[in-house]
UniProtKB/Swiss-Prot annotation:
<keyword id="KW-0687">Ribonucleoprotein</keyword>
<keyword id="KW-0689">Ribosomal protein</keyword>
<dbReference type="GO" id="GO:0019843">
    <property type="term" value="F:rRNA binding"/>
</dbReference>
<dbReference type="GO" id="GO:0006412">
    <property type="term" value="P:translation"/>
</dbReference>
<dbReference type="InterPro" id="IPR019927">
    <property type="entry name" value="Ribosomal_uL3_bac/org-type"/>
</dbReference>
<dbReference type="GO" id="GO:0003735">
    <property type="term" value="F:structural constituent of ribosome"/>
</dbReference>
<keyword id="KW-0699">rRNA-binding</keyword>
<comment type="function">
    <text>One of the primary rRNA binding proteins, it binds directly near the 3'-end of the 23S rRNA, where it nucleates assembly of the 50S subunit.</text>
</comment>
<dbReference type="Pfam" id="PF00297">
    <property type="entry name" value="Ribosomal_L3"/>
</dbReference>
<protein>
    <recommendedName>
        <fullName>Large ribosomal subunit protein uL3</fullName>
    </recommendedName>
</protein>
<dbReference type="InterPro" id="IPR009000">
    <property type="entry name" value="Transl_B-barrel_sf"/>
</dbReference>
<keyword id="KW-0694">RNA-binding</keyword>
<keyword id="KW-0488">Methylation</keyword>
<comment type="subunit">
    <text>Part of the 50S ribosomal subunit. Forms a cluster with proteins L14 and L19.</text>
</comment>
<feature type="modified residue" description="N5-methylglutamine">
    <location>
        <position position="153"/>
    </location>
</feature>
<dbReference type="InterPro" id="IPR000597">
    <property type="entry name" value="Ribosomal_uL3"/>
</dbReference>
<comment type="similarity">
    <text>Belongs to the universal ribosomal protein uL3 family.</text>
</comment>
Length: 214
């Protein structure tokens, strides 16, 4: 349980290390993260910090959310995200505070959550990496068919979770253990090694890695 940041994916590029290696990185814009609410064990039963980022037109904000933000004295943002934290961490924040990119350090491992790029309705080959059937030798119309999806009269049904064709992508997923290679405090940009889920401009959530790796 630790505080993170929300932002958007700018895109991918590369930087060069001191030894000349080309390092592929994803640029994340985590500017203007503002605290909208502080939750404490006394009032809410747990400790958490709620943040928002970016800007949103007032006409796009519903009355309940507008009232919530007005109470905190915070301008409407693009999204709200709550981070569970330790009880002692809550004391260091109050509504309206700005959380900067210096929350992270170079070399630190982070987990990045985003919405994967949607691929539409896809077959089992693309969606689940199934192999195709035989091209010939008696096969005529079943080249990319999934094959059998059940058994016999017993159980007489298709079990839930059976891998079949359907919507592929457009799901929330997390890439774990990405290394922070650069922290741009001036422009509030975070550069992490490798790719993160989602398309350019997509919302992302960055938090310290939950799994320690050597």
């Amino acid at each position: 349980m630790s505080l993170g940041l929300v932002g958007r994916k700018v895109g991918m590029t590369r930087i060069f290390a001191e030894d000349g290696r080309s390092v592929p990185v994803t640029v994340l814009d985590v500017s203007n993260n503002r605290v909208t609410q502080i939750k404490t064990p006394e009032s809410d039963g747990y400790a958490a910090v709620q943040v928002t980022f970016g800007k949103r037109r007032a006409s796009r904000v519903g009355k309940p959310l507008a009232g919530h933000l007005a109470k905190a004295g915070v301008e409407a943002g693009h999204m709200l995200k709550e981070f569970r934290v330790e009880t002692e961490q809550v004391a260091g924040f109050k509504a309206g505070d700005v959380v900067g990119v210096d929350l992270f350090a170079v070399g630190q491992k982070v987990d990045v959550t985003g919405t994967s790029i949607g691929k539409g309705f896809s077959g089992v080959g693309k969606r689940h990496n199934f192999s195709s059937n035989r091209a010939s030798h008696g096969n005529s119309v079943s080249h990319n068919a999934p094959g059998s999806i059940g058994m016999a009269q017993d159980p007489g049904r298709v079990f839930p979770g059976k891998r079949m064709a359907g919507q592929y992508g457009n799901t929330t997923c997390t890439t774990q253990g990405l290394e922070v290679v650069r922290v741009d405090v001036e422009r509030q940009l975070l550069l992490v090694k490798g790719a993160v889920p989602g398309s350019k401009g997509g919302d992302v959530i960055v938090r310290p890695a939950v799994k320690a790796r050597g």
